[in-house]
């Protein structure tokens, strides 16, 4: 608690923002509550890694074999104690953050409802193979490798909008059904990533706006709605390029619709609960390692696993698969994909990032985190840990 208060007192004077209010809020949320959350995860994970190992090394588990103790007392008790500590620290952290004041309401963020990357990649593969100008080395490559490469690159696929043309992307109906406050967030680019002038018209159902700015910037475009606009519209975000140059964007990354959600305090509450779910999973993982390994080895293994979990998504993003990739690099990518898939329960929730960007932590995402990170995964890990504890205790008695 004292360290949390110290972080809220000292860190705001150290970190620097871009000078804007929005930038200052984002930097504060990432630097102060984010740092408290990160340190809490590492500290409780290391603590959990030593609980059972220390009891085993001091022969207390051998006594548990003489006077049988339930798995709840051996493992669920320490887990609940660690989670209670985390809940107190996170609640204190949230209280200090909200008391600072000056926060803005959060917003729902909607992405376009596009075809799955696998389907889009298959269609693109058919077009590539049907093109007579496709190199022979591409035609002779295994289809599964080509498909894997296209799926990985689908998220960064650009679409071009020439002057006088328009492009549309479907969105959920609720994105255009709100009474006010609809914003289109778009990042335009050019062929050589050069800064250029931009002008056009953005429409979403009954909402519309005229945009005149520059490319290479993330634009938040407030949309307005005529008072006499009736029914009969579709929820498609359309952009008509009225400028003189072709603009480009990535539909899966650069196009979003924002609508009002609720207050920052409610979003902070949901984000804190999501943080607690992740901490619960980490504590259960630490207790599981503690039953099988000595304390130093368990702590080392847990910290390495935590670092690899955070690095795997970045590796997949920065080093995409190519046809001429060496076998050793392909093996590394396969391992990174496996790690990213296996640890998605921990790396998936991004409560600090959502708070910093003003994104609403949805109740559905919180429910998924609570079910997977706080219930299912800890039950599985602690059940395995309880089995190992009883086996070790029985072996010591024998």
Which residue stretches match the model-derived regions?
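Hydrophobic/aromatic residues in alpha-helical transmembrane segments
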Residues: 41-48, 61, 96, 285, ...
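Terminal transmembrane helical anchor/hairpin motif
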Residues: 10-27, 99-100, 104-261, 308-388, ...
């Amino acid at each position: 608690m004292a360290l949390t208060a110290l972080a809220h007192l000292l860190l705001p004077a150290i970190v620097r923002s871009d000078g804007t209010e929005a930038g200052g809020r984002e930097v504060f949320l990432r630097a102060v509550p984010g740092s408290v959350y990160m340190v809490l995860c590492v500290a409780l994970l290391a603590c959990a890694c030593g609980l059972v190992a220390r009891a085993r090394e001091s022969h207390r588990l051998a006594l548990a074999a003489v006077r049988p103790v339930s798995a709840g007392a051996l493992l669920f008790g320490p887990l609940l104690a660690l989670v209670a500590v985390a809940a107190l620290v996170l609640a204190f952290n949230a209280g200090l953050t909200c008391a600072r004041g000056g926060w803005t309401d959060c917003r729902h963020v909607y992405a376009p409802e596009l075809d799955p990357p696998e389907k889009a990649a298959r269609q693109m593969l058919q077009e590539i193979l049907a093109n007579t100008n496709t190199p022979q080395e591409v035609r002779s490559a295994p289809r599964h490798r080509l498909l894997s490469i296209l799926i990985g690159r689908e998220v960064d696929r650009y679409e071009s909008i020439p002057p006088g043309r328009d492009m549309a992307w479907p969105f959920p109906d609720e994105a255009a059904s709100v009474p006010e406050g609809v914003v289109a967030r778009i990042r335009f680019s050019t062929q050589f990533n050069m800064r250029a002038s931009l002008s056009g018209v953005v429409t979403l159902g009954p909402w519309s706006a005229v945009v005149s700015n520059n490319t290479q910037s993330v634009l938040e475009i407030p949309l307005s709605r005529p008072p006499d606009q009736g029914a009969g519209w579709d929820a498609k975000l359309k952009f008509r390029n009225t400028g003189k140059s072709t603009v480009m964007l990535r539909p899966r990354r650069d196009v979003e619709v924002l609508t009002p959600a609720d207050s920052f305090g409610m979003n902070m509450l949901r984000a804190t609960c999501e943080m607690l779910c992740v901490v619960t999973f980490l504590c259960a993982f630490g207790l599981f390692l503690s039953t099988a390994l000595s304390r130093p080895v368990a702590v080392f293994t847990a910290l390495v696993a935590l670092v690899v979990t955070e690095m795997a998504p970045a590796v997949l993003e920065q080093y995409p698969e190519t046809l001429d990739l060496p076998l050793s690099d392909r093996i590394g990518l396969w391992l990174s994909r496996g790690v990213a898939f296996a640890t998605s329960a921990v790396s998936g929730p991004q409560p600090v990032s959502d708070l910093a960007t003003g994104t609403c932590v949805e109740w559905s995402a919180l429910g998924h985190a609570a079910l997977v990170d706080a219930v299912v995964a800890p039950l599985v890990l602690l059940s395995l840990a309880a089995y190992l504890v009883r086996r070790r205790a029985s072996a010591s008695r024998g």
